[in-house]
UniProtKB/Swiss-Prot annotation:
EC number: 3.1.1.-
Any one GO molecular function term: lysophospholipase activity
A Pfam cross-reference name: NTE_Ploop
Motif GXSXG: positions: 973-977
UniProt name for this protein: Patatin-like phospholipase domain-containing protein ZK370.4
Protein family according to the UniProt entry: Belongs to the NTE family.
Composition skew (Polar residues), residue ranges: 91-123
Record-linked CDD domains: CAP_ED
Biased composition (Basic residues): 126-138, 170-184
Annotated spans, Disordered: 49-188, 199-218, 1230-1249, 1274-1293, 1305-1353
Sequence motif DGA/G, location on chain: 1095-1097
């Protein structure tokens, strides 16, 4: 037996070895076979048998003569692309010369080459032909290789030119070139390239698909349009005058008479307008530059504004004086020529003639003037500069001019005032009503006959108020017109901290919390109050309070409108009653404060322009762009260009109008002048500056630059640009979209925390008139919509299903456009939105959000990329549509297409259903509520940090958030947080997340997977294949675009050394990149650009700042990272490794805590992350959570349940505390949410140098420029010195003075009406120290225009 065993032992061992290593043997055989194939293929070809030779030669013998074949073999040897040479040169075209030099063998030899299978020449030809075929295959494989050099490309081009150029001489290889080419074409090189290229085939294909699927924004999205040129049929002066008067919307009856235009030329320094001249014309600069100055005592002049060519010098308030026949003159305002220029002067006295002919036609222009006064002048000076009482004329100065009128009828009534019986509070109510009628008629400029008295008496009622009673609160919308009959009222304003009143987040909260109410003006008997509110339809600008026991006559808005229809001439006296209370200071400032109207696409300013003014957005929307990249967007209430004005730097970005916008322009000279006149303005501006610098959504100066995927399309992430929205247009993508139910659902979700108005064509036609929808631009409709936008914080415009005038109007009015589509259907080739964009430019620059509606039973969305690749969308949202939205679909199916496009009856039914059943049951966790919070800037973001197995605590925190009713609108994470966040974004159900996360943690606990994934540690210990398989099995091929909730994850790009924020692409790949710990897993090659990505924890382990930049107002950050020990051993300035080793080996001592090389490298890698985390902890927007997970290690994946329960316990306590301490009511229940008002936009301003500190900017803001005042005519007008006139450094110091520089002229007959007060010249002071001004406005000026006398000492 031993003999047989020893005989067959090797055989038994061989069989056993083969049986146990079948795969290894097969792999070895395949490798050897492949190598043998390439070697034999390169050296000998496939075969040398006669049959193969015959088969190879037969096609040639059939297709061409023997003589032709004899020429082909040498030709193949001389060119690089022999097949093409055979095809082109083998049968040369007629008339094409050929210079190919070949040696023709004898014919007998050619026959032998064809018929003999053993001929050596034919065998060599075959080998060369096959070798060249392999070369061609190799070139086709590597032609797209990124490693190709320009030399290779040029060689290919030369070869193509040689081959395809008919009749050209084939290029012969040089000796060196041939050897070099042979080395690159070896079989081993081919195999190497096949392996290398094949391993990247998936990622290359993915990259090409991603580049093709995303649509770039249109060119108009970033670049402003050019200004319109002057029509050739119009003279420049006519064009400029009409352009500057366009904002008034003058009646069609008024026509411009070119004969009234006077054009004059001026030299530099010449006066165009001097103090004392009449203010009854508009001045327009045809060419050159003009400067506006304020003239003071002793001939001092102060530059406050520069007017370029095309600009105008005119105050709209002066127009009311002219219409009221009040002589208006310039007090101290002067206009001078900075350069040699031409100026057009147009007298506006023709306005008065047109007004007297048709007062009703001038109601709209008068309303525009009063609205401009409120929106531009009063709002800017009060809310942004902190002025209140300075804006109104003081009582002792105003007493003389109350009830002043210019009409002859009213003058007659004023002359009889002293003979009238005064109002007696003890009279009966009927006698009081008679007096009230008469006084009200006089205030309206009417004759108090029986008819007028009867009409007024039916529309007014009398009320009595005790002292201190508040009649109307500031900001109230109660529109009434009141006349004081007895006693007096006080108009007061609260503190001017605009942002603190709205958001209560001011830098000086302690001061703003105190009630700061200041009395502005006192209103006495026979004066009107409330005209500003009733004419503009705006909330009250003042708080009206009774100073003593007061008796007033009140006319409500509807009664005033009815009386106005009968007597349209009363509109002007009511407007002038507002004008008479304005202080001389405000009337002077009005000349320098510009009302800028910017149409869609036009630039407010461009990059590189001098920053000589700041802008306040009154309405509309603007976008700041830089190098085809969106920096930010501005909405109502935002301030533009303040930082650049302070730092005196050119504009860093270009700001263009997204839609028609109105702005208030404050020149730098005017800003400095106001600070000199009222130094407290400087403190207010410092406070405003501090509000911008205290914003927590500013990027930290040390933060790594973020690369968001939409940057490749020329824009930053759009979610941060949809804040501060005031108007939203909803456009259906197809006729089957339930548009009316969608707008009702959105209205329901938005109305939980602010007032919302939903407008459709049907509702507008019912409120106004169906005829307003027939015109493309109806002024009545435009004004009505503007009033609604001023009244309601948010307006939803519901578009029609077709291209109607109403649809175009909605797009023009919209700050953002929501394109609603059915998610389960493929996008149509021609949608309504695309048709609208092709037909006109309305809304082409507006951010468009794609809304995909899905049935409630949908598990996960899919196919989102098909929608995104057809049209450009700045963002997308997935919404589960409740079943109630689809209950009207059957009715739509029964209707014709025309009936579907105008669903009037169905709309009424839908609205009625929602009003009865839906509007009273808010649901904060619905998808519509999530969309509403994102649109209003109140999104709640959840950030999950990295920490390995400790990330199981995130699952517990998610369950705690759900139990406490805290919704999550955006999810982001790093490392393990990206995986848990991806699970929640894919399925927003904490139970499902827990199940799937537990399964993945269980797989990560397997030791065999780790052993099978081990490899030679060149880049990492593991290949990453098993880890990739586990994540792929979890997410499959899900894309980030197909997640229910907006999601991002963080990775570290070691190719460019920056942080990457991923918001699109394959979910598993970027989760894998975010979890790739260096040394354990190799970096992931980005599927889009091939960059190497590692764990995001190296740069930002808790990306709360990224979440804030994406638009989240409240960020809940859960940190599960390890805490590094800081109590280390102090070993001095040198360290011996042997000493440390001996200390650790000593069993009787405690080893010192000294970092080894691996720990030092790890801490260096996390330096920026640790610093970022400290900033996040201190941020006011961040709610920082840290479960007690210190006992657990990074790789404790088997302890999932234990860690999760710990996170759940901690999360319940933390969430309860968050809701308790949430003063803003963002995280609380519905009742708390209703107390919250929408956040106003206070985003960061365009980038300025970070070297400029807040202290430097505050000093620049509050600094009063010290300049040397000069006498008139001595001002330097050289624009080459320190820039154009009117820029920084060209202003003049203003001494305290009586600021009587308005165009205000009062009737002398109105002085001391009741005879109960006496005035002297010294008492007629409004602002500043005593001066020589006399009473009555115009009396203080010399009628001849001479220099005013100096003030008395």
């Amino acid at each position: 037996m031993s003999f047989f065993y020893s005989l067959f032992a090797p055989l038994i061992f061989l069989v056993t070895f083969i049986y146990n290593h079948v795969l290894l043997i097969l792999f070895t055989v395949c490798i050897i076979g492949a190598a043998a194939f390439f070697v034999s293929y390169y050296l000998f070809g496939y075969s040398n048998t006669p049959s193969s030779a015959s088969s190879s030669a037969t096609p040639s013998s059939r297709n061409s003569p023997n003589k032709e074949r004899s020429k082909k073999v040498p030709t193949i040897l001389e060119t690089d692309n022999e097949d093409d040479e055979i095809r082109v040169n083998g049968s040369p075209k007629s008339g094409t010369p050929t210079n190919t030099q070949t040696i023709e063998p004898p014919t007998s030899l050619n026959l032998n080459m064809v018929n003999s299978a053993s001929g050596s020449n034919l065998s060599g030809a075959r080998r060369m032909r096959k070798r060249d075929w392999a070369k061609k295959l190799y070139k086709s494989l590597v032609q797209d290789s990124p490693g190709r050099t320009p030399t290779d490309e040029s060689s290919d081009e030369e070869n193509a030119n040689v081959v395809m150029g008919g009749g050209s001489v084939p290029r012969r290889r040089s000796k060196h070139g041939n050897s070099s080419r042979r080395r690159q074409s070896t079989a081993f090189q081919l195999a190497k390239d096949l392996i290398r290229r094949g391993s990247r085939s998936y990622f290359r294909q993915n990259q090409e698909n991603n580049k093709d699927t995303r649509v770039r924004p249109p060119q108009e999205f970033f670049e402003p349009t050019d200004l319109p040129e002057i029509p050739q049929n119009l003279q420049p002066e006519i064009f400029y005058i009409l352009h500057n008067l366009k904002m008034l919307e003058l009646p069609s009856e008024w026509k411009l008479d070119p004969r009234e235009i006077e054009v004059r030329s001026f030299q530099a320094g010449d006066y165009i307008v001097k103090p004392g001249e009449s203010d009854d014309a508009i001045y327009v600069a045809i060419d050159g530059e003009l400067t506006v100055h304020i003239r003071h005592m002793e001939g001092k002049e102060y530059l406050v504004k520069c007017i370029p060519a095309g600009g105008s010098f005119f105050s709209l308030l002066s127009m009311l004086d002219i219409l009221m026949d009040f002589p208006s003159i310039f007090r101290t305002v002067a206009l001078k020529a900075a350069d040699p220029c031409r100026v057009a002067k147009f007298p506006i006295t023709s306005f008065r003639e047109s007004y007297h002919k048709n007062p009703e036609a001038w109601i709209r222009p008068i309303q525009i003037v009063i609205t401009r006064l409120l929106h531009v002048t009063l709002t800017t000076l009060h809310q942004y500069m902190g002025l209140s009482s300075e804006l109104m004329r003081r009582r002792r100065d105003d007493d003389r001019h109350r009830n002043g009128s210019s009409t002859s009828k009213l003058q007659l009534s004023l002359s009889l005032k002293k003979k009238e019986k005064p109002f007696n509070i003890n009279d009966n109510e009927q006698d009081q009503l008679i007096v009230a009628r008469k006084w009200m008629a006089e205030a309206f400029g009417l004759v108090a006959d029986d008819v007028v008295s009867e009409q007024i008496g039916s529309k007014i009622h009398l009320e009595s108020y005790e002292a201190g009673h508040v009649i109307i609160e500031q900001g109230a919308e109660e529109e009434v017109l009141m006349m004081v009959l007895h006693g007096n009222l006080i108009l007061a304003q609260y503190g001017s901290d605009f942002f603190a009143q709205i958001e209560r987040e001011s830098l000086f909260d302690e001061e703003n919390n105190e009630e700061d109410e200041s009395a502005v003006i006192r209103v006495t008997a026979r004066e009107l109050v409330g005209g500003l509110q009733i004419l503009t339809n705006e909330p009250s600008f003042y708080t009206i309070r009774a100073a003593v026991q007061t008796r007033v006559a009140i006319m409500k808005k509807k009664d005033f409108s009815a009386f106005l229809e009968a007597h349209p001439e009363i509109y002007l006296p009511v407007a002038h009653s507002v004008l008479r209370r304005l202080s001389p200071f405000l009337r002077g400032v009005d000349f320098a404060l510009d009302w800028v109207l910017v149409d869609s696409g036009h630039a407010c300013y461009r990059a590189g322009d001098m920053a000589d003014s700041l802008f306040v957005v009154l309405s509309g929307r603007l976008r700041s762009v830089e190098k085809k990249t969106v920096v930010e967007e501005f909405g109502r209430g935002d301030v533009l260009g303040m930082m650049e004005v302070l730092t005196k730097k050119p504009r860093a970005t270009t700001v263009l109008a997204v839609r028609f916008s109105q702005l208030a322009r404050v020149p730098e000279g005017l800003l400095n002048f106001i600070k000199m006149q009222y130094p407290q303005v400087g403190f207010r501006l410092v406070q405003l500056l501090g509000q911008y610098y205290s914003q927590t959504n500013r990027r930290a100066p040390f933060a790594a630059p973020t690369v968001i995927r939409t940057n490749e399309l020329g824009a930053t992430d759009p979610m941060s640009h949809i804040k501060n929205l005031h108007t939203i247009a909803v456009v259906p993508a197809s006729p089957d979209v339930p548009l009316v139910p969608f707008t009702c659902e959105l209205y329901h979700a938005l109305s939980s925390n602010l007032r919302v108005l939903r407008l459709s064509s049907q509702k507008v036609a019912a409120c106004l008139d169906p005829s307003v929808l027939e015109k493309q631009a109806d002024f009545r409709l435009m004004h009505w919509l503007n009033v609604q936008e001023d009244t309601y914080p948010l307006v939803i415009y519901e578009c029609d299903f077709t291209q109607t005038n109403w649809t175009r109007r909605c797009l023009r009015q919209a700050d953002a456009i929501l394109v609603v589509a059915i998610g389960g259907k493929t996008p149509e080739k021609q949608t309504l939105m695309r048709e609208l964009m092709n037909m006109n430019q309305d809304g082409v620059r507006t951010n468009k959000e794609l809304i995909l509606l899905w049935p409630e039973s949908t598990k996960t969305p899919s196919g989102t990329i098909e929608w995104l690749k057809n049209s450009y969308f700045s963002g997308h949202h997935h919404i589960r549509a409740p079943k109630r939205m689809l209950q009207w679909n059957r009715k739509f199916r029964k209707m014709s297409r025309a009936e579907v496009m105008t669903p009037t009856s169905v709309e009424n039914e839908v609205i009625e259903y929602y009003e009865k059943n839906v509007f009273w049951t808010p649901d904060r966790r619905s998808d519509f509520s999530r969309l509403a919070r994102i649109l209003t800037g109140n999104a709640i973001g959840l950030v999950l940090g990295g920490g390995g197995a400790r990330g199981a605590a995130h699952v517990g925190v998610l369950r705690a958030l759900r139990e406490e009713g805290i919704p999550v609108d955006i999810v982001g994470g790093t490392s393990i947080g990206s995986l848990i966040g991806g699970l929640y974004a894919e399925t927003p159900d904490d139970v499902v997340v827990e199940t799937r996360a537990a399964s993945w943690f269980n797989g990560m606990s397997s030791l065999w997977r780790k052993l099978l994934d081990l490899t030679y540690a060149h880049s990492a210990m593991f290949t990453g294949a098993q880890f990739n398989f586990s994540i792929k099995d979890l997410f499959e091929e899900r894309l980030i675009e197909d997640l229910w909730i907006s999601y991002f994850c963080i990775s570290t790009d070691i190719s460019t050394s920056e942080m990457r924020v991923h918001r699109s692409g394959p979910l598993w790949a970027y989760c894998r990149a975010s979890m790739s710990l260096a040394g354990y897993l190799p970096p992931l090659c980005d599927p889009q650009d091939g960059h190497l990505l590692l764990d995001g924890g190296y740069v930002n382990n808790v990306p709360a700042d990224v979440m804030r930049n994406l638009g989240a107002r409240c960020v809940i950050a859960c940190d599960v990272g390890s805490i590094e020990e800081t109590n280390l051993y102090d070993y001095g300035d040198s360290l011996s490794g042997m000493w440390v080793l001996l200390k650790r080996l000593n069993p009787f001592g405690t080893p010192p805590r000294i970092l080894n090389m691996e720990e030092i490298q790890s801490r260096l890698a996390y330096v920026s992350c640790v610093r970022q985390l400290e900033v996040v902890k201190k941020a006011s927007y961040c709610r920082y959570l840290r479960p007690p997970i210190e006992p657990f290690k990074t790789l404790d994946f088997p302890k999932f349940q234990e860690i999760m329960e710990l996170g759940l316990k901690y999360g319940r306590e933390a969430c309860h505390e968050l809701i308790t301490n949430d003063r803003a009511g963002i995280l609380g229940d519905e009742k708390e949410t209703r107390k919250f008002k929408r956040q106003q936009s206070r985003r960061e301003k365009p980038d300025v140098s970070r070297a400029v500190s807040f202290t430097d900017l505050a000093a620049a803001m509050s600094k009063i420029p010290v300049v040397r005042p000069t006498l008139r005519h001595s001002m330097s007008l050289n624009p080459s010195a320190n820039g154009p006139v009117g820029r920084a450094g060209d202003h003049f110091l203003l001494d305290d003075d009586l600021f009587n520089d308005t165009d205000y002229y009062e009737e002398e007959s109105s002085q001391s009406e009741n005879g109960n007060e006496s005035f002297t010249e010294d008492e007629d002071l409004v602002i500043g120290p005593p001066s020589s001004s006399s009473s009555g406005g115009n009396v203080s000026e010399n009628p001849r225009g001479t220099t005013p006398r100096p003030p008395s000492s």
